[in-house]
Every structure is written in C-alpha cells, then in structure tokens.
C-alpha cells in the first residue's frame, strides 16, 4: 500500500485557488462548533452560512458553492432539513461533505448516515472509528472520540471511497486522504488540537470548501488537512494552553499564503 505525501507546490496551488474562489459553504453543522467553524472558514478566506430551516436549507443548497452535513447534534427536525439539503445539492450538483460524528456509537445517526450515503457525498471526513463504522467494518469509538489508529482505517476508507465515489478523509495523528486508489498522508499538527472542541468539525467545513475548487480534488482536500495541521503547529508555539490556542489558530490560518506553502 503506497502512501504519497502532499508537496508544498500542491498545497500552495490549492490555497491560491481557495483564495481566488472564496467558496460559499452551507454549514449544517452541530450546535457546539458553529462559531468556531464559521471563523475558521472566514480566516482562510471562505464565506460560511448556517442555514438550518428545512425550506431554506433546500433553497440555499442550490445557491452555495458547497454543503457540509455534520450530524454531531442530530435531531429529527434537523435530519429532515439535512435530507432536504442533500437532495437539493444532488439536483443542483452542489458538492457536499458528510461528517459522521459518533456514527459508530449511536444507532439513529448511523442509520441516517447510511441513508445519506445513497446520495453519494463528494467527500466524507471522520476519525478512524467513524470511518470504519460507516464502512460496516466495525462499530466503535467512545462518543465523538476514536478508539482506533488512523492507519488502521485506510482499508475501510478505500472501500468507502470506491463504493460511494467520495474522497474519504481519516483524521488522526497522521491524516489519510483517499479516492479509493491513491492515498495521501498528511503529517503534522499537535495533540493540543484535540483539546479544543471543533477542530475536526471545522476541518470538515474546509474540506467541503475544497470540494468546490477546480483541479485535482484529492490534492485539494489533502491540502485542507495540511493547512489545518500547519496552523495548529504555529498556534501551539504561541499558546499556553487550549484557551489561548483558539485565537492563535485563527490568526495562523489568516496568515497562511501560497508563498509560505511553496
């Protein structure tokens, strides 16, 4: 199994495209992370929108550059709105990303996420336990936390990618991004990133934005992982703990440039 690395030139090119296109991302995400997710997108140069009313969600999915479905605080009314948005995204050919939070631990969301897979997400982003559960290989995870190493989920990610046509992202100490055939590994980041609520969910929003960019989608999505890890490293160097990490992280995202990547 060959795992390629993302080059600086590839990351720089993707960031140039990101700044050039400034994707409008329709974030149907969980209540805990909405502000952090929006600020992450803004810091990178995208435009976030949090539209959750069923009728509006369907309408907005046709307008947005990309759609994010994050099931972290799933309710039946929210599931109805998400379903409507995904169906409209499919009709409008709007790329959409699924973040199957805690899918291996809870039955209702697992059934809902499996239903959504039939609508062929453009990308799927989760931790190892979530990706393995979604692929039907194992049920695991401790709530939103993974109990598996990211590398162990690569076969599940490849299977899921081939079955759905999605780019699948497994996040962990090393992130792995695959289209079912190619695999890109992204090293970096810092353990402190796991002590702040929302870094993974925010990454899913950036992944969604990158799905709206032209060019090589696998490389664009892998670049999203690289930017977040890079910003995390820079933020940790300036932080004293989780409380000071968040503003430094947003600043680091803001300061990323294609020239720095290259």
Curated annotation (Swiss-Prot):
It comes from Escherichia coli O17:K52:H18 (strain UMN026 / ExPEC). It catalyses: 5-(2-hydroxyethyl)-4-methylthiazole + ATP = 4-methyl-5-(2-phosphooxyethyl)-thiazole + ADP + H(+). The keyword Magnesium applies. Keywords: ATP-binding, Kinase, Magnesium, Metal-binding, Nucleotide-binding, Thiamine biosynthesis, Transferase. It holds the Pfam family HK. The lineage of its organism: Bacteria, Pseudomonadati, Pseudomonadota, Gammaproteobacteria, Enterobacterales. Its cofactor is Mg(2+). GO terms for molecular function: ATP binding; hydroxyethylthiazole kinase activity; magnesium ion binding. ATP binds at residues 125, 171. GO terms for biological process: thiamine biosynthetic process; thiamine diphosphate biosynthetic process. Pathway: Cofactor biosynthesis; thiamine diphosphate biosynthesis; 4-methyl-5-(2-phosphoethyl)-thiazole from 5-(2-hydroxyethyl)-4-methylthiazole: step 1/1. Belongs to the Thz kinase family. Its EC number is 2.7.1.50. NCBIfam families: PRK09355.1 (NF006830), thiM (TIGR00694). Catalyzes the phosphorylation of the hydroxyl group of 4-methyl-5-beta-hydroxyethylthiazole (THZ). Substrate binds at residues 50, 198. This is Hydroxyethylthiazole kinase.
């Amino acid at each position: 199994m060959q795992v390629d690395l993302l080059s600086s030139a590839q990351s720089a090119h993707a960031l140039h495209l990101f700044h050039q296109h400034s994707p409008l991302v329709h974030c149907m995400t969980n209540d805990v992370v909405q502000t952090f997710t929006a600020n992450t997108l803004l810091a990178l140069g995208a435009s976030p929108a949090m539209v959750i009313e069923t009728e509006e969600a369907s309408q907005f999915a046709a307008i947005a550059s990309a759609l994010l479905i994050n099931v972290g605080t799933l309710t039946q009314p929210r599931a109805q709105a998400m379903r409507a948005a995904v169906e409209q995204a499919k009709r409008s050919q709007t790329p959409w990303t699924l973040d199957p939070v805690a899918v291996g631990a809870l039955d209702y969301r697992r059934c809902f996420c499996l239903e959504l897979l039939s609508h062929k997400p453009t990308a799927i982003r989760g931790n190892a336990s979530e990706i393995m559960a979604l692929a039907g290989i194992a049920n695991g995870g401790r709530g939103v936390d993974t109990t598996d190493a990211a590398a162990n989920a690569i076969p599940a990610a490849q299977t899921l990618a081939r079955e759905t046509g999605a780019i699948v992202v497994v996040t962990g100490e090393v992130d792995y991004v695959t289209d079912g055939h190619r695999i890109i590994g992204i090293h970096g980041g810092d353990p402190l990133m796991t002590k702040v609520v929302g870094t993974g969910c925010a990454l899913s929003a950036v992944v969604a934005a990158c799905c709206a960019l032209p060019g090589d989608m696998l490389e664009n999505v892998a670049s999203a992982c690289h930017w977040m890890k890079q910003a995390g490293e820079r933020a940790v160097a300036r932080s004293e703990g989780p409380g000071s990490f968040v503003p430094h992280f947003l600043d680091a995202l803001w300061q990323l440039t294609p020239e720095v990547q290259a």
